[in-house]
Amino acid sequence: MRWVWALLKNASLAGAPKYIEHFSKFSPSPLSMKQFLDFGSSNACEKTSFTFLRQELPVRLANIMKEINLLPDRVLSTPSVQLVQSWYVQSLLDIMEFLDKDPEDHRTLSQFTDALVTIRNRHNDVVPTMAQGVLEYKDTYGDDPVSNQNIQYFLDRFYLSRISIRMLINQHTLIFDGSTNPAHPKHIGSIDPNCNVSEVVKDAYDMAKLLCDKYYMASPDLEIQEINAANSKQPIHMVYVPSHLYHMLFELFKNAMRATVESHESSLILPPIKVMVALGEEDLSIKMSDRGGGVPLRKIERLFSYMYSTAPTPQPGTGGTPLAGFGYGLPISRLYAKYFQGDLQLFSMEGFGTDAVIYLKALSTDSVERLPVYNKSAWRHYQTIQEAGDWCVPSTEPKNTSTYRVS
């Protein structure tokens, strides 16, 4: 394990390799939204949560730590990636301190909650730091199709794993820290058992509108329509994590507003952004439609790529949102949707506008964590060598067949 041995220069990290090898042999245990609710119900047991997390968190950490070692050496050698690796190793060792502790000891439970808060804070900057590592790699070595494909595959899994780990930590710390959230007293941890979808839409719109008004001195209006197939007279509610939904919607609103304002800069009236929320038997779908000029079909997948950001690289100390400069808004938003078996897709008509659709599971029993697992299938993905395509590639200058030429 190349990166682990480098970390062994620090004696305090010497136990990491054996823990990584041990826990990476187990597959993560995905939880459903209903199970999260049960963990945090009025009969929630801190000892049960402690016993589960001290086993499950190392499994999730070790699985992704094994996988990161499959990245190209050139990526692993960047200072930013090495820093992220050191955070993961330290967090794993922090949890190992509790493997043999007694769940009946209240001091142990309190110390465990404090340790989880420390781990969560340590990992606050994982996304921008890993993004910086990708930039360091690109600046030094340029673009390589095979490496790019592996990095895209890994980062989707790495960031999804991070979302899941933070979800577990947040649920435990929010429920068992001995206090209630005064702003959201009915929330169970970070989950709202009765999340009003349209209210989250409005909150995300209002924040994006503030930014749009600040930079463009104008912003499009919002039109919301709800279709509840089960009961047309009832507003649409679901069991969900409002912060996850807000993250997705805020990113989509920012993109839609910018496209709308910039494509209608000579118009006195901006076309509104239309949002439709539809609840069916299986899916809850949210469609956001703008008239911002659209995107060519060939560029759609690039919008979800970590390697093709057109945004300027963020400069330290300039303020603002760090992710804005890395162009990670859409790919991370899609991962939030996929985390509980949903999806985020874009449908664009160049010259007109774009529809963005968020698909979520309508039932809490169907909303089950989507988790990466380190196994032979994942390993083989990194060993794949890009071969020549089996479709003709059109030349940039098609052959002129209008005139007969003697060869």
From Swiss-Prot:
Residues with N6-succinyllysine modification: K376
Name of the protein in its database record: [Pyruvate dehydrogenase (acetyl-transferring)] kinase isozyme 2, mitochondrial
Family according to the record: Belongs to the PDK/BCKDK protein kinase family.
Subcellular location: Mitochondrion matrix
InterPro entries, A to Z: AK/P_DHK_N_sf, BCDHK/PDK_N, BCKD/PDK, HATPase_C_sf, His_kinase_dom
Main subcellular location of this protein, as a coarse class: mitochondrion
Tissue spec. comment: Expressed in many tissues, with the highest level in heart and skeletal muscle, intermediate levels in brain, kidney, pancreas and liver, and low levels in placenta and lung.
Molecular functions (GO terms): ATP binding; protein homodimerization activity; protein kinase activity; pyruvate dehydrogenase (acetyl-transferring) kinase activity
